[in-house]
Amino acid sequence: MARITIEDCLKRIPNRFQLTLAATYRARQITIGSTPQVELEKSDKDKPTVIALREIAAGKVGLEVLNRGQA
């Protein structure tokens, strides 16, 4: 399992407040059933928030998630 740091995510979304909102919205989408956009191993038992941060750090999700609204 790769470690995700806030610094990795801040490279994609420089504003901490927007990063928090984007991660929260995306985590809610994943919780409701949206498919994660990053590769997950079967042994990974990451929470939706960690998956959302992985997606942001990988550049798969950005501020556009805020424009889509909640799921």
Curated annotation (Swiss-Prot):
A Gene Ontology cellular-component term:
DNA-directed RNA polymerase complex
Give the gene symbol: rpoZ
> Reaction catalysed by this chain?
RNA(n) + a ribonucleoside 5'-triphosphate = RNA(n+1) + diphosphate
GO-annotated biological processes: DNA-templated transcription
According to its UniProt record, the EC number is 2.7.7.6
Q: What does this protein do?
A: Promotes RNA polymerase assembly. Latches the N- and C-terminal regions of the beta' subunit thereby facilitating its interaction with the beta and alpha subunits.
Q: Which domain of life is it from?
A: Bacteria
What are the protein's UniProt keywords?
DNA-directed RNA polymerase, Nucleotidyltransferase, Transcription, Transferase
Q: Which residues form a coiled coil?
A: none
Fetch the PANTHER family from UniProt.
Answer: DNA-DIRECTED RNA POLYMERASE SUBUNIT OMEGA
Quote the protein name from its UniProt record: DNA-directed RNA polymerase subunit omega
Its top-level enzyme class, in one word, is transferase
Q: Which InterPro entries does the UniProt entry name for this protein?
A: DNA-dir_RNA_pol_omega (IPR003716), Pol_omega/Rpo6/RPB6 (IPR006110), RPB6/omega-like_sf (IPR036161)
Quaternary structure annotation from Swiss-Prot or TrEMBL = The RNAP catalytic core consists of 2 alpha, 1 beta, 1 beta' and 1 omega subunit. When a sigma factor is associated with the core the holoenzyme is formed, which can initiate transcription.
Kindly list the organism's lineage: Bacteria, Pseudomonadati, Pseudomonadota, Betaproteobacteria, Rhodocyclales
List the Pfam families.
RNA_pol_Rpb6
- Mention one GO molecular function: DNA binding
**Similarity section:** Belongs to the RNA polymerase subunit omega family.
